[in-house]
Amino acid sequence: MEESAGTPFHDPKYFVSPFILNTDEGRYLVLKAIKLCNVRTIDCMKQETSCVLKVDKPQSPCPISSSDSAPKCYMQQTSPQQQRQAPQLRFINTGALSNLFANTTDKAARVINQ
């Protein structure tokens, strides 16, 4: 049975074909969606609402550009002082880790076999 990230292709509740969703904020590429069945929709009339909870939209590191031709991502630049203060996490090469594990395993096997 073919599956796409845990959702079967034959199940009518899932859309596995990508599509574009146009909104006021921009265009979104939807890779997977779930079809809603028998879910109640409540329309909100602004004149009749008594209390609305306002939630500020989080700022994206990539601002939405006005032109749709070539969207570019502008990451926030940090000053050299901020870069020096931030600790850098160093990663060990996975090849070095596997060699270390293999050497330790070999040494342990030799000790046990003696």
Swiss-Prot record:
Signal peptide: none annotated. The keyword Phosphoprotein applies. Residues 76-86 have a biased composition (Low complexity). The modification Phosphoserine is found at S60, S69. Keywords: DNA-binding, Host-virus interaction, Inhibition of host innate immune response by virus, Late protein, Phosphoprotein, Viral immunoevasion, Virion. The keyword Phosphoprotein applies. It comes from the Viruses. GO terms for biological process: symbiont-mediated suppression of host innate immune response; viral protein processing. Its main location: virion. InterPro entries: Phosphoprotein_F17. GO terms for molecular function: DNA binding. It is found in: Virion. Phosphorylated on two serines. Residues 58-86 are annotated as: Disordered. One of its GO terms (cellular component) is virion component. Pfam families: Pox_F17 (PF04767). Self-associates to form high molecular-weight forms. Interacts with protein OPG157. Interacts with host RICTOR and RPTOR; these interactions disrupt the mTORC1 and mTORC2 crosstalk. Plays an essential role in virion assembly and morphogenesis. Also plays a role in the inhibition of host immune response by dysregulating mTOR. Sequesters host RICTOR and RPTOR, thereby disrupting mTORC1 and mTORC2 crosstalk. In turn, blocks the host antiviral response in part through mTOR-dependent degradation of cGAS, the primary poxvirus sensor. Belongs to the orthopoxvirus OPG062 family. This is Phosphoprotein OPG062. It comes from Fowlpox virus (strain NVSL). The lineage of its organism: Viruses, Varidnaviria, Bamfordvirae, Nucleocytoviricota, Pokkesviricetes.
